[in-house]
Amino acid sequence: LKPKGGKAPSRHAGRVLAVRAAVGEAVELRFDANQGFNVEQRLRFVEAARSAKLEIVEQPTPRSEPDLLGRVTAAVHLPIMADESLVTLRDAYRLARGGLADMVNVKLMKVGGIAEARQIVAVARAAGLECMVGCMDEAALGIAGGLAFALSRPNVHYADLDGHVGLQGDPSAGCMTLK
């Protein structure tokens, strides 16, 4: 599960702890801060939510401030994943070279398709960064492409491919079934 945050960061730790209490220890729990924290808020959140045993924290700081992302990554015990900070191959290189994140979230629709995503994932692999393939709100056909891409890359260990769920008028609805 991946609860989303971004507004009212002072309340996020309590919400994450409530989710953990509701689902128990058997469920992996991640948190997407949606660029909503400054460094101090992020550090307070990590300490307050420590007992929730989060697996990953996604994009805790604003995309416009990559150095903040690096400071948070260096200061906390949890893997920090860049999402909004990764749009181009140059972003991947900057994140990897600067040690600004532990992981990257590659979204095919955001980065410009499979060819660009392959290069980004290769940069991440060379730098020792794990990858997740994520998605935007997109049709099931795009999700199927993301899944095929994720399964074809050796350093993609996570997928968050639910952007088609609840999409109204999806012309490719039913094109794939996950079991």
Regions found by a protein language model. Give the residues of each.
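Short helix/strand-capping turn motifs
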Residues: 154-159, 163
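Oxidoreductase and adenylate-handling cofactor-binding alpha/beta cores
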Residues: 148-154
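Catalytic core of soluble alpha/beta enzymes
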Residues: 3-142, 169-178
